[in-house]
Curated annotation (Swiss-Prot):
Organism encoding this protein: Streptomyces coelicolor (strain ATCC BAA-471 / A3(2) / M145)
Protein's UniProt name: Bifunctional protein HldE
Keyword Nucleotide-binding tagged: yes
Gene3D superfamilies: 3.40.1190.20, HUPs (3.40.50.620)
Leading EC class: transferase
Amino acid sequence: MTGPMAVRTDRTPLVVVGDALLDRDLTGTADRLAPDAPVPVVQECAERIRPGGAALAAYLAARDGREVTLIAGVGEDPAGLALRELLAPWLKLIPLPLTGTVPEKTRVLAQDRPVVRLDRGGGRVREATDEARDALGCARAVLVSDYGRGAADALRDVLAARPPLVWDPHPRGGPPVPGTRLVTPAEKEAHGFAPSEGRPGGGLRAAALNAAALVRDWRVAAVTVTLGSRGALLSYGEHPLLVPAPAAHHGDSCGAGDRFAATAAGLLADGALVGEAVEGAVGAATAFVAAGGAAAVPPAGSERALAALPDTDDPGALAARIRAEHGTVVAAGGCFDLLHAGHVGLLQAARRLGDCLVVCVNSDASVRRGKGGGRPVNPLADRVRVLRALACVDAVAVFDEDTPERLLGELRPDVWVKGGDYAGADLPEAGLLKEWGGQAVLLPYLDGRSSTALLARAAEGAR
């Protein structure tokens, strides 16, 4: 089953195995304490539900435009039925029989800050099904999200015979099967999983020792320890590799691990090297937190009417259609003269923030005024053609002014994206976005990648 977003045929289908949760946020305000106890009174709560656990990882992968099958314990209880309804437009669900009910995680937030979390429903998977075994047996790419509620255990023999690309472990889950290509524990989880020679405490050295010990103990190809705003540390050879997060964003990190695992699995499935997959996953997770984490993911249920994006040359019509269907319009801008890895990474991360991405491109005259003689190297028609060929770009709009403010006023995007090289500077378009409730955000940018630097190196080499 395809989701509201068009499935990209150039992306390898992904099977996600694990434990599905139903996440619920109750968000309100708190300006006083209860008279009978020193606890805040949260009032005027708005309720929102979304997929959690393996279901969130699968949902995020589907939002990337990938064909996804989720194998998880989902029953006919109210939480299970709600989860089925949320996921149905996006992916194929192969339910495993469940003893008990789907686990629910409820967060109460005041001014977007967690006050308390309530957990209920301790359902566990009883057994595997033939349908699940068959789906795994012919899967080209597998992600395991093991929260210790029986899904991975029930299918362990099949997983052992066909090691997954990525295994996202959690404290109550078991070890990954030998041969797994990449395991993605968080820093605290890695310390808990590490054998006796693992280094206790925090810091990069402890993470490196723990990761190396887990590679040996689990007999897997690689372990990457996620470090929050510091990035991730990858161990798969003689020396560890630190992949820093290009820009630190301290926000709601709920779901960031699922975003990391889903991105890494997708990149590996499409042929990326492990180091490339981790770098892409760090960027995606950083962008995810910057946009508000799982709480900011557009509600799955409200998007069921969204059809595949139209093949249109009218960015304004596309933006209007997405808004009318309660979707999120994302825009990014630049010259994009010599398209490089920094551009591509930025645009891929931007696309994950909403339901369409419109790229605003400077005209040739605008580039000349801003960059000087000799620019652009590539004329506008070529730059637009290359951008339209990217799977993450849904439409391209051109502006002739020095800034895209007029064009943004016409498109009225919900999110305006700039690269991390603007970090510390005021975004000139931020005030304009506020006029219609939009948000300007910084996303990670690969250091050292720029068209100007490429031209300088080319000129140096020609001497």
